[in-house]
């Protein structure tokens, strides 16, 4: 079976939560016999196709942007051409240009949309985009939400409940670098033996300005890994508040990130807006057995982190509540250890890449069978899928 994924950006050009989901999905479904290709846009000059983790990556030039919406004239032809060769076209939403490209390329193959997030911030543009968005979502064969929380709370998905299902994101720990003793020693010396960790792109909805406000009056080390649009403002805020115990590391290699995930006392994830639909770095914390602190925003973050069980969940945009959660975990190491152990157990039960891959491969098969029952009867394009645990 051949699956074409379409998203605005991907490895090696960018590293983010959705890119990690697509990567894990491709790695997992490849093991089940799926041939994956990712079509994305890039600003790089060298756009030769590459192989990455066992799947193909094809990049088209990013020509221009409208309200942060990446566009490519060449991608229209590429999508039309590559869709003809695919058994299933897998779209990753939101990306308004993708909706337009779907119609302009006249894609006539089984289609699935991974609905990664509502569009939250661009209110003015959203009004103009609404008709295209709903025409696109109505036209595809299946929509997938990453958590029951998001499916229940999204007003957009409520219109498409009859063709929407939940397949949770999953991670494969074996795809992460192993523990490097030298890097562990380096970071232990640099940040100390006990610290809270945040990992992610420094965006407006990550709530890091709230975390910095919560850190005022505490002396607990907090390590913030990543870069992004809010980096300068956050560093200025930390300096203004005199937060000498907060370390901004910038972008790090995966080996360093893994070392910090191994060493961290707990994971702080203060995202306060629905743009944070799931939280891959929160799931990474669970995978590494860390107690978590997150906010209740009606999304997948509270499906990963169960208040009082795997960590603490506080109201969004509430520095005092966040400060209290940091203090509770810091002052109760036995509680933190127990929560971390339960977080890892929940990851193993619900969030492995094997489960995600099995769910999506079964969906691909279902879509192909509905579109071409004769081929399905002959076994063309289908693979055997083990039952999800």
Language-model regions, residue ranges each:
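Short hydrophobic beta-strand element within catalytic cores of glycosyltransferases
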Residues: 287, 291-295
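A conserved mid-protein helix/loop that constitutes part of the nucleotide-sugar donor-binding site
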Residues: 20, 194-217, 229-235, 358
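Acidic donor-binding loop of glycosyltransferase active sites
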Residues: 87, 196, 262-277, 290
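N-terminal strand-loop element at the rim of the active site
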Residues: 6-15, 21-69
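Short His-centered aromatic/hydrophobic patch
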Residues: 91-98
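A short, active-site helix/loop in glycosyltransferases that binds the activated sugar's phosphate group
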Residues: 138-178
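Nucleotide-activated donor-binding/catalytic signature segment of Leloir-type glycosyltransferases, i.e.
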Residues: 235-255
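Conserved acidic donor-binding segment of nucleotide-sugar-dependent glycosyltransferases
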Residues: 306-308, 312-319, 328-333
């Amino acid at each position: 079976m051949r699956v074409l994924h379409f998203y605005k950006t991907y490895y090696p050009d960018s590293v983010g939560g959705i890119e990690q989901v697509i990567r894990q999905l491709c790695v997992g479904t490849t093991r089940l016999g799926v041939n994956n290709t990712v079509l994305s846009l890039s600003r790089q000059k060298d756009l030769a196709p590459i192989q990455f983790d066992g799947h193909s990556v094809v990049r088209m030039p990013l020509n221009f942007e409208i309200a942060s919406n990446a566009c490519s004239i060449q991608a229209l032809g590429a999508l039309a051409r590559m869709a003809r060769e695919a058994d299933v076209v897998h779209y990753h939403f939101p990306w308004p240009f993708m909706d337009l490209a779907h119609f302009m390329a006249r894609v006539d193959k089984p289609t699935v949309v991974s609905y990664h997030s509502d569009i939250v911030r661009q209110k003015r543009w959203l009004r103009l985009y609404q008709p295209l968005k709903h025409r696109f979502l109505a036209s595809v064969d299946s929509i997938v939400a990453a958590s029951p929380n998001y499916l229940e709370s999204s007003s957009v998905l409520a219109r498409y409940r009859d063709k929407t299902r939940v397949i949770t994101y999953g991670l494969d720990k074996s795809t992460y670098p192993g523990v490097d003793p030298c890097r562990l020693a380096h970071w232990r010396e640099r940040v100390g033996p006990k610290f809270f960790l945040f990992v992610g792109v420094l965006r407006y909805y990550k709530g890091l300005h709230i975390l910095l406000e919560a850190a005022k009056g505490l002396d607990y080390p907090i390590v913030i890994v990543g870069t992004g649009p809010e980096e300068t403002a956050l560093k200025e805020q930390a300096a203004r508040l005199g937060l000498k115990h907060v370390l901004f590391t910038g972008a790090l290699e995966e080996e360093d990130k893994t070392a910090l995930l191994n060493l961290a006392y707990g994971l702080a994830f203060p995202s306060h807006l629905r743009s944070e639909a799931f939280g891959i770095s929160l799931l990474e914390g669970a995978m590494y057995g860390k107690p978590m602190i997150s906010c209740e925003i009606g999304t997948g973050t509270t499906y990963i982190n169960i208040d009082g069980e795997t960590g603490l969940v506080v109201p969004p945009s509430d520095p005092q509540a966040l400060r209290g959660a940091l203090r509770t975990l810091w002052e109760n190491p036995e509680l933190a250890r127990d929560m971390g152990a339960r977080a890892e157990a929940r990851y193993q039960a619900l969030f492995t890449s094997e489960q995600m891959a099995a769910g999506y491969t079964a969906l691909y098969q279902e879509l192909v069978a509905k579109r071409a029952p004769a081929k399905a009867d002959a076994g063309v394009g289908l693979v055997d899928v083990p039952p999800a645990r």
